[in-house]
Regions:
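Signature of multi-pass transmembrane helix bundles
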Residues: 2, 6-40, 68-190
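Solvent-exposed, non-transmembrane amphipathic alpha-helical segments
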Residues: 49, 53, 65, 115-116
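Membrane-helix interface motif
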Residues: 48-60, 185-190
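Hydrophobic alpha-helical transmembrane segments of multi-pass membrane transport/permease proteins
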Residues: 37-49
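Perimembrane loop-to-helix junctions flanking transmembrane segments
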Residues: 55-75
Length: 190
C-alpha cells in the first residue's frame, strides 16, 4: 500500500516539476537568474563588506570599538543602492530577451531596452536611496512578464507580419510602458 502511494506521489511530483520547468515564464526566469548571478554575488559581497566594516554602525566597528572615518558614507550607500538597481535592470533585460525569444519574436531590442529603462524608472527617485529585498526581484519579473506579453500581443494583432522594430507604433508602446513604470514608482514610494 505504502509503496503504491509513494510511487503515485513521486510520479505526481515529477509531472508537476516537468510542467513548471516547461513554463515559458519560469524557464526565462531561471535563465535570467543564472545570467545575473555573478553580478548579484558581487552586490551581496559589497553589501556584506559595507555592513561589516564600512558603515559607521558596522558590526566589526562596534565590536572592536574602531573609529573609522569614511568621508563619503552617504555616497557609498547611494552607490550600493545603484548597484542593486543595476542588478535588477540586468535581470529585467535578460528575462525580456529570453522570454520573447521563446515566443519566437526576432526583434527583441526595443522591449529589452524598454524593460531595462522601466526598471530604472521604477526603482530610482531623485534624492532617494531605498533599500531592497528579494520581493523586488519578483516585482521586476512580474512587470517584465506583463510588458513582454503586451508587446507580443501588440505585435501579433496590431502590426502584422514583418514589423519595423522601431516603428512609431512600437515607440508609442514603449512610451506607454515607461509611463506605467513611472506611475508605479510614485505609487510604491508613497
Amino acid at each position: 500500500y505504502w509503496s503504491d502511494m509513494n510511487k503515485k506521489l513521486i510520479s505526481t511530483i515529477v509531472n508537476l516539476d516537468n510542467f513548471v520547468l516547461k513554463n515559458r515564464m519560469v524557464n526565462a526566469t531561471l535563465v535570467a537568474m543564472q545570467q545575473t548571478l555573478p553580478l548579484l554575488a558581487i552586490c551581496v559581497y559589497v553589501q556584506l563588506m559595507s555592513h561589516l566594516i564600512l558603515s559607521p554602525n558596522a558590526l566589526l566597528v562596534t565590536l572592536f570599538n574602531w573609529h573609522l572615518r569614511i568621508p563619503a558614507d552617504i555616497q557609498l550607500q547611494e552607490m550600493l543602492s545603484l548597484l542593486e538597481v543595476f542588478v535588477l535592470m540586468i535581470l529585467s533585460a535578460s528575462f525580456t530577451k529570453h522570454f520573447l525569444s521563446m515566443r519566437k519574436i526576432a526583434q527583441t531590442t526595443l522591449p529589452t531596452l524598454t524593460n531595462f529603462l522601466g526598471t530604472y524608472f521604477l526603482f530610482l527617485g531623485k534624492g532617494q536611496t531605498p533599500t531592497y529585498d528579494t520581493s523586488q526581484y519578483l516585482l521586476v519579473i512580474l512587470l517584465s512578464f506583463i510588458s513582454c506579453e503586451s508587446f507580443y500581443f501588440y505585435q501579433k494583432f496590431v502590426s502584422g507580419d514583418n514589423p519595423q522594430p522601431f516603428a512609431v507604433r512600437f515607440l508609442i508602446w514603449a512610451a506607454l510602458i515607461l509611463l506605467i513604470d513611472v506611475a508605479l514608482h510614485f505609487a510604491i514610494q508613497r
